[in-house]
């Protein structure tokens, strides 16, 4: 059985483990009402009961002191969840030194997911209170609001340092009372809604695009994590472009349709994926690992997490304070979870080692990037839609290599119908791998593309067909606006196989 058949068989036998809308609460900040439209759009799309919307006045700052967190967020949120029947327990009048009212659980919480929306504060500042475990090398009671709220169904715990996440590496965990959280947030409500709609489109039509992995970070352990993503991406049909130097992908690198962007390590968005024209594919899974990637969500120019939301990420991650490498999200486990049929939120928690710590998860936790089989994507591929080309490319990537005569014929036919450079280049590369020599077609019928793809095509054409042919290709494509496609006959759908 080929890789494609194995992949399809795996997906058809996996039950979609989606979060339960009735057991999901959504928190908005009435002091920043722009988040309400995001909450309503999300709740409507996912069928979350209107009664599960919790609106509290939470101020206008990203950072809260512990007393404010306790009295403005944690206490009132527990009260509302108790009233809604989503939490079982009793609040006490007495408070601890951080201002938290005592809480005694009296049963298992119905609540399973808590989604925080744009405008809800981001993090809790260090209190200065000496911890109970001075031997703990991971010190401090500072944390992301999201990660701290994951413990709201438990008695108040000492927040010094990180706690193990019971969902880490376990698909069947009960959670030990930990409530999984996610956040719909970014620099602007418009960016958040656009990223959400992109994820919903990808869930309905399939996650389509290419993969890019940036190695060369400061520690071998992290590089090993990202390197472990290469084989699974190939097995999924997304053979990645890999940057192995200490630098980011250069601005001249290829960057079309990034469905997966996984890498590190720069403080600010830079390189190819720090450029505004490098838009992510709808629903993209994007992670740039940096200690302070979500220090603020207000300024995408200086923080990777809001930048990736701005660029369209369906799922991304960030750290609000220094997390230490071993306690950050594990990209190879994220891929493992997604491959096994987990939703974006489930896979994110499967890949997160710690709770009551620094991480945040940005995106719709219900999002299923592989809800549509590749077979269905190939059947739906149309010459009218550029992303359909990437479904076809993924299909051909999963066939035995080099491609045989019939597969090459079908790839050539698809490339001719499309008229777009990504598919045409892939066809020429496949022919070269199979030992087939054919002239490069006149570029007049090709659409214009992003600069990195043009550069890759020019290098290939120069090596295979000569300098003059390559120069003609570059001159023709670079004089057109990106995405401009000449009229051509034959825009019927591509055959399935």
PLM region descriptions:
Residues 385-392, 417-425, 449-456, 469, ...:
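Generic helix N-cap/helix-start motif at coil->alpha-helix transitions
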Residues 406-415, 437-448, 469-479:
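Alpha-helical repeat scaffolds
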Residues 3-13:
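Bacterial N-terminal signal peptides
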Residues 468-497:
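Terminal, low-structured helical/coil segments at or just beyond the last alpha-helical repeat
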Residues 18-410, 416-420, 433:
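Cysteine-dependent hydrolase recognition
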Residues 393-397, 426-432, 458-463:
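Conserved small-residue packing positions in alpha-helical repeats and bundles
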Residues 401-403, 433-437, 465-466, 482:
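Short coil/turn linking the two alpha-helices of tandem helical-hairpin repeats
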């Amino acid at each position: 059985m080929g890789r494609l058949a194995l992949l399809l068989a795996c997906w058809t036998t996996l039950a979609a483990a989606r979060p339960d809308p009735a057991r999901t609460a959504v928190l908005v900040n009435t002091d920043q009402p722009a988040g309400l439209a995001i909450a309503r759009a999300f709740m409507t799309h996912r069928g979350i009961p209107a009664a599960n919307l919790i609106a509290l006045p939470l101020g206008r700052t990203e950072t809260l002191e512990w007393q404010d967190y306790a009295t403005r967020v944690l206490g009132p949120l527990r009260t509302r969840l108790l009233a809604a029947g989503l939490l079982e327990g009793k609040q006490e009048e007495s408070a601890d030194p951080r201002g938290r009212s005592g809480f005694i659980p009296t049963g298992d919480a119905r609540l399973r997911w808590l989604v925080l929306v744009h405008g809800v504060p981001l993090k809790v500042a260090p209190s200065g209170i000496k911890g109970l475990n001075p031997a703990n090398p991971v010190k401090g009671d500072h944390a992301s609001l999201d990660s701290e709220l994951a413990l709201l169904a438990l008695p108040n715990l000492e927040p010094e340092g990180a706690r193990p996440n019971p969902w880490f590496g376990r698909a069947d965990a009960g959670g030990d009372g930990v409530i999984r959280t996610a956040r719909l947030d970014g620099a602007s409500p418009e960016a958040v809604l656009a990223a959400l709609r992109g994820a919903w489109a990808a869930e309905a039509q399939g996650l389509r695009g290419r993969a890019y992995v940036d190695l060369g970070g400061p520690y071998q352990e992290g590089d090993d994590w990202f390197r472990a993503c290469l084989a699974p991406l190939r097995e999924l049909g997304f053979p990645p472009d890999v940057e192995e130097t200490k630098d980011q992908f250069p601005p001249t690198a290829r960057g079309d349709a990034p469905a997966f962007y996984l890498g590190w390590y720069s403080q600010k968005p830079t390189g190819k994926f720090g450029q505004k024209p490098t838009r992510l594919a709808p629903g993209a899974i994007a992670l740039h690992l940096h200690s302070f990637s979500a220090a603020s969500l207000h300024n995408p120019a200086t923080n990777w997490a809001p930048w990736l939301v701005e660029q369209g990420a369906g799922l991304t991650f960030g750290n609000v304070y220094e997390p230490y490498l071993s306690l950050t999200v594990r990209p190879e486990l994220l891929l493992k979870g997604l491959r096994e049929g987990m939703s974006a939120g489930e896979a994110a928690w499967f890949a997160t080692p710690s709770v009551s710590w620094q991480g945040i998860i940005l995106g719709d936790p219900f999002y299923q990037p592989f809800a549509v089989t590749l077979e269905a994507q190939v059947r739906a591929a149309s010459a009218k839609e550029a992303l359909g080309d990437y479904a076809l490319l993924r299909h051909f990537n999963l066939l035995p290599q080099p491609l045989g005569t019939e597969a090459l014929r079908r790839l050539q036919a698809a490339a001719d119908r499309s008229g777009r450079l990504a598919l045409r280049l892939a066809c020429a590369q496949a022919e070269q791998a199979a030992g087939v020599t054919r002239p490069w077609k006149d570029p007049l019928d090709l659409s214009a593309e992003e600069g990195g793809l043009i550069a890759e095509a020019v290098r290939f054409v120069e090596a295979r067909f000569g300098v003059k042919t390559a120069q003609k290709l570059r001159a023709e494509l670079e004089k057109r606006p990106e995405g401009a496609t000449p009229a051509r006959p034959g825009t019927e759908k591509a055959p399935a196989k």
